[in-house]
């Protein structure tokens, strides 16, 4: 099977699998929910937009940012609801409304400059050794700063040296920031951060579910599980795209 055919089948698997899982999970949760049915349906729709965005992103398509805009706005609202109910999510809510939403427009403009259009793929690039060092140091410093700030104000954080609710809020938050920045500027290394986002987000929503969180927690566990699978394929595709771009220099 050639690479293009594999990518088409893999994208179809992610889209169909996510859609089926969402329909079944939402139907079960909807039937058993006494309240919050509107939020449940909104979460399901946002998750579907998110999987369309991440599949498009993995394949280097600029339509990523249309689906992404709907996804991040809805997810920010869901995180805010989870935090209001006593769980984690404050940092992610702030991130999505003040950073992720406007970055969809930034990414659209940047990808157009790097050759992506309705049918073509973006010209990907890679970090060099020095850039890797700076990105790594900035990531560590940002993680510490965000932890200290959110631990100070997050009402869900219990007392103690290490507040796990805050850790699960901060790690996907910082990975999201760096992943989006590298994505908008078309760097292959974005996928290492997206893999981190997906792992930590699954952990966060699983913890919310185990402590009696919102009925939409299961939807987000499914969503980020599919995202995680897609992230590894995205890394593979973007590695090849960056090699192709280097060869054309």
PLM features per residue range, with description:
Residues 47-55, 74-77, 98-110, 175-178, ...:
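Alpha-helical transmembrane segments and their membrane-interface exit regions
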Residues 70-123:
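Hydrophobic, ordered structural segments
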């Amino acid at each position: 099977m050639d690479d293009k055919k594999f990518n088409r089948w893999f994208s179809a698997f992610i889209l169909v699998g996510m859609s089926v899982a969402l329909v079944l999970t939402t139907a079960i949760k909807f039937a058993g929910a006494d309240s919050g049915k509107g939020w449940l349906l909104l979460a399901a729709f946002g998750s579907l937009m998110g999987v369309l965005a991440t599949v498009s992103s993995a394949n280097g398509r600029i339509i990523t940012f249309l689906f992404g805009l709907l996804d991040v706005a809805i997810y920010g609202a869901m995180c805010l609801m989870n935090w209001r109910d006593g769980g984690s999510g404050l940092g992610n809510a702030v991130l999505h409304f003040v950073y992720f939403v406007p970055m969809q427009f930034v990414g659209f403009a940047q990808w157009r400059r790097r050759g992506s259009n309705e049918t073509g793929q973006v010209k990907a690039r890679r970090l060099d050794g020095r850039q890797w060092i700076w990105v790594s140091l900035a990531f560590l410093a940002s993680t510490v700063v965000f932890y200290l700030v959110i631990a100070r104000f997050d009402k869900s954080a219990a007392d103690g040296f290490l507040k796990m609710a805050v850790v699960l809020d901060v790690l996907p938050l910082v990975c999201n920031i760096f992943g989006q920045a590298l994505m908008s500027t078309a760097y292959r290394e974005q996928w290492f951060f997206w893999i981190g986002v997906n792992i930590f987000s699954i952990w966060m929503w699983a913890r919310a579910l185990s402590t009696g969180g919102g009925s939409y927690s299961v939807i987000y566990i499914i969503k980020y599980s599919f995202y995680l699978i897609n992230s590894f394929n995205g890394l593979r595709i973007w590695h090849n795209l960056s090699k192709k771009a280097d060869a054309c220099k």
